[in-house]
Amino acid sequence: ADIAASHETALSDLPPMHKPEGAKPRLLVVDDNEDMLQFLKSSFEETYDVVTATNGMEALSLLENHQISAIVSDLMMPKMNGVELCRAVRGNQSFSHIPFILLTAKTDNFSKIEGMNCGADYYVEKPFSTHFLDACLTNLMTRRKQLAQKFSQEPLAPPTALAATP
């Protein structure tokens, strides 16, 4: 398949916002490398409805218009890099809850700390194992589902229920 052609139609081909029961969670993969986008899409398309963006600006557009369950983003990209995207996601109440994984070739401690300080849930270094990335996604999705269940049963939980663990 021609990745450029599939990327051009990605925004218009997405299903509507509501997800029917049993629908796959939608994974947003953001990377300026077309080969990496295709690799991640083919690696995760059995489990997720994978949509792609080539930079942070495209990713924000997808987030504004579609229900996204998790984000995997490269760090170094043009227009808006992964750290800037993560900060924008965490700063927007509409999607600040979405699990966010930075996937990058940058292995220095400064980059790792910057990635975690911007609000990323995981910082995964390239080269990486798709099994490890899948475990990270599964862990984040499970925790999110557990949190949603807890607050659906106790919608008016006291603020102490949200308190950080010491």
Task: Put a short name on every predicted segment.
Residues 38-42:
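Charged docking surfaces used in two-component/phosphorelay signaling
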Residues 52-70:
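Acidic, metal-coordinating helix/loop segments flanking the phosphotransfer/catalytic sites
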